[in-house]
């Protein structure tokens, strides 16, 4: 279960999405994005993680129960955290994902852009910060192993994390862009 073999494919996927002009929820949180578009991207990105997880229920016969139980244990562990921790961990993820997307967009070439993305993603994974879209995928995998009440609690937790992701992106925009424009 090393970070590089299990979680780094997410970093590669983010690079692919950005390279092909895709929109990432945590990447646009800090941009001047209308709330309606932000909500729409949240739903679409969430579906992009939830649908493959649900499909995996029927396609992975051996190990599906074990995978679901592991994902459930992860989600229940997160539920044991203080809601302020969810918000702050979401905020820090939002900061790093904003830096990833801005770093990618402002990079002088693709190699530097990819390095910015991978640096930010490794940072939020190693630090244990919370990413609302990723947590939707974990929840979808865990659903067969959770009670209805636990699913509702996880959904509430993901909403708090999502707010943290948004606040983190907005905070970085204030620090890096808005204050500079104000001083100019």
What are these regions (language model features)?
Residues 1-184:
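Alpha-helical transmembrane segments and their helix-helix packing motifs
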């Amino acid at each position: 279960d090393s970070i590089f073999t299990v979680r780094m494919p997410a970093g590669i996927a983010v690079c692919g999405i950005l390279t092909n002009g895709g929109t990432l929820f945590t990447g646009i949180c800090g941009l001047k994005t209308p709330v309606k578009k932000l909500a729409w991207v949240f739903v679409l990105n969430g579906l992009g993680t939830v649908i493959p997880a649900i499909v995996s229920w029927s396609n992975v016969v051996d190990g599906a129960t074990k995978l679901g139980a592991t994902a459930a244990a992860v989600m229940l562990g997160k539920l044991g955290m203080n809601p302020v921790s969810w918000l702050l961990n979401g905020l820090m993820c939002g900061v790093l994902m904003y830096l990833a997307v801005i770093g990618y967009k402002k990079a002088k070439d693709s190699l530097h852009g990819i390095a910015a993305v991978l640096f930010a993603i490794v940072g939020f994974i190693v630090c244990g910060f919370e990413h609302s879209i990723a947590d939707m995928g974990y929840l979808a995998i865990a659903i067969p192993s959770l009670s209805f009440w636990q699913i509702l609690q996880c959904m509430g937790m993901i909403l708090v994390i999502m707010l943290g992701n948004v606040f983190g992106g907005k905070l970085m925009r204030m620090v890096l862009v808005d204050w500079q424009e104000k001083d100019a």
